[in-house]
Amino acid sequence: MKDRYILAFETSCDETSVAVLKNDDELLSNVIASQIESHKRFGGVVPEVASRHHVEVITACIEEALAEAGITEEDVTAVAVTYGPGLVGALLVGLSAAKTFAWAHGLPLIPVNHMAGHLMAAQSVEPLEFPLLALLVSGGHTELVYVSEAGDYKIVGETRDDAVGEAYDKVGRVMGLTYPAGREIDELAHQGQDIYDFPRAMIKEDNLEFSFSGLKSAFINLHHNAEQKGESLSTEDLCASFQAAVMDILMAKTKKALEEYPVKTLVVAGGVAANKGLRERLAAEITDVKVIIPPLRLCGDNAGMIAYASVSEWNKENFAGWDLNAKPSLAFDTME
């Protein structure tokens, strides 16, 4: 049987990425052009800046992805692209590039949900057994998702306010840490002690919902009050206490979800899945089901994960028309 090559595009936020997947599971290339340095001075992603950067580098990313994969444009079988959720301007750049390539070569266009990409990146570790449960944690999302089969997603719990990654960046900004702050907070947390009593919102409530705004506010208030009084707080202890509260919330809700949905596999994915503290808690506390976490290179935004997620859509012949548009607020239950 002839090999299948999927060319995948990811431009939902501040990473321009193009990848090539051979058949179902052989990732031949995964080119990522990061914009972090451009956004650091603003303390967060500026949508217009992100869009301009995508336009500047996406052609080079396509060329590099094909060259690294050792194939030509004529070898590509299908084109996959993130169409949401994300920043509308950023999404449109990837969509325009993907549709142009697909149209020029007469190829099918596969629409992919960005968060499905994060989840299906676990396929790079080993073949996934369904049904499974997924904890998706990133800068824009905190969700528990039940996956009955590849491509069939149901959100069973999500944050009511801030995403966990968003909370990390906001408290990092208060402490004067470099954006994005997640990795630095994680490192500092391992050097400090959990001595500050931060709230664990909704941790005992009988649902699978998350809330991090109260924790964020409590952190900011403690830091602000100390500054007003001229008191010095240990950055390491602040980070350790904040991270302990976050992990307590994530673990409590995940354990409850596993009780309600008896599966054999838990996938933990998204940018925050790179967090060392989270990985340690998962290893220590989730022992009765298999826990699969994508490798670090596939935790952040990348086109490789979009390629993996596109396989189930290819198998279902879920192809999009040329009118496919960006859906910045796309949810799992509104996929094309």
Swiss-Prot record:
Subcellular location: Cytoplasm
Matches recorded under InterPro entries: ATPase_NBD (IPR043129), Gcp-like_dom (IPR000905), KAE1/TsaD (IPR017861), Peptidase_M22_CS (IPR017860), TsaD (IPR022450)
Pfam families, alphabetized: TsaD
Positions annotated to bind Fe cation: 114, 118, 301
BP terms from Gene Ontology: tRNA threonylcarbamoyladenosine modification
PROSITE patterns given in the database record: GLYCOPROTEASE
Highest taxon above the source species: Bacteria
Cofactor, how bound (note): Binds 1 Fe(2+) ion per subunit.
Positions with a binding annotation for substrate: 136-140, 169, 182, 186, 275
An annotated GO cellular component: cytoplasm
Keyword Aminoacyl-tRNA synthetase: no
This enzyme's EC code(s): 2.3.1.234
Entry cofactors: Fe(2+)
Record flagged with keyword Metal-binding: yes
GO molecular function, one term: N(6)-L-threonylcarbamoyladenine synthase activity
Swiss-Prot/TrEMBL catalytic activity: L-threonylcarbamoyladenylate + adenosine(37) in tRNA = N(6)-L-threonylcarbamoyladenosine(37) in tRNA + AMP + H(+)
Keywords: Acyltransferase, Cytoplasm, Iron, Metal-binding, Transferase, tRNA processing
Disulphides: none
Known role: Required for the formation of a threonylcarbamoyl group on adenosine at position 37 (t(6)A37) in tRNAs that read codons beginning with adenine. Is involved in the transfer of the threonylcarbamoyl moiety of threonylcarbamoyl-AMP (TC-AMP) to the N6 group of A37, together with TsaE and TsaB. TsaD likely plays a direct catalytic role in this reaction.
Record-stated family: Belongs to the KAE1 / TsaD family.
Protein name, as recorded: tRNA N6-adenosine threonylcarbamoyltransferase
Name of the gene this protein is made from: tsaD
